[in-house]
Amino acid sequence: MAQISKYKRVVLKLSGEALAGEKGFGINPVIIKSVAEQVAEVAKMDCEIAVIVGGGNIWRGKTGSDLGMDRGTADYMGMLATVMNALALQDSLEQLDCDTRVLTSIEMKQVAEPYIRRRAIRHLEKKRIVIFAAGIGNPYFSTDTTAALRAAEVEADVILMGKNNVDGVYSADPKVNKDAVKYEHLTHIQMLQEGLQVMDSTASSFCMDNNIPLTVFSIMEEGNIKRAVMGEKIGTLITK
């Protein structure tokens, strides 16, 4: 019997660092294979899935800006880094016989389709895995904001935020403060008021304004994406 997901359509947000593993840089083949297997498992259920991958394992626009680069140029470099991650994930998924499409906000027709909202929705309706890359196509906006915007555009039920170094949202950094408390449930306004570093304030405000729930969980535990899709209580749930 096919397992039933809680959600019809989800957006999975992965940090670039999640693909790097312990080295913190580049793409770890073992990690990306594990992520692809988890995504493929969800795709076989009755759930449509879109993925957004950051580029921090290759380049961070803010880092370049802090070093004196033009912020716009640095951010565009970061967008290109997300395309590299997206293509690597697409390749891993296709090796698992998953029909996958990469849609980019910056046109590069030789390697991916340009992002068109209706096309993205159509791919999802056809049960294809969609990977959004190159951010929203504009500098100064993070991939967290991309996840929020794309989730609203494709009418996703939830954003699943897979983290590589934490299993939910805590009152403080659990690696630094042993008294940090893990939250099972939060509201968007709490997250903003308490300055909890789940996503940047632009993305948080957008999710709150558009009533988009988030589940924050560890991507490093095998099977957690499936558990999140099935609505199991893992990580932290954030709602309006």
Curated annotation (Swiss-Prot):
Regulation affecting activity: Allosterically activated by GTP. Inhibited by UTP.
Pfam families found in the cross-reference section: AA_kinase
Keyword Kinase tagged: yes
GO BP terms: 'de novo' CTP biosynthetic process; UDP biosynthetic process
Major location (coarse): cytoplasm
Function: Catalyzes the reversible phosphorylation of UMP to UDP.
Protein name: Uridylate kinase
Organism: Staphylococcus aureus (strain Newman)
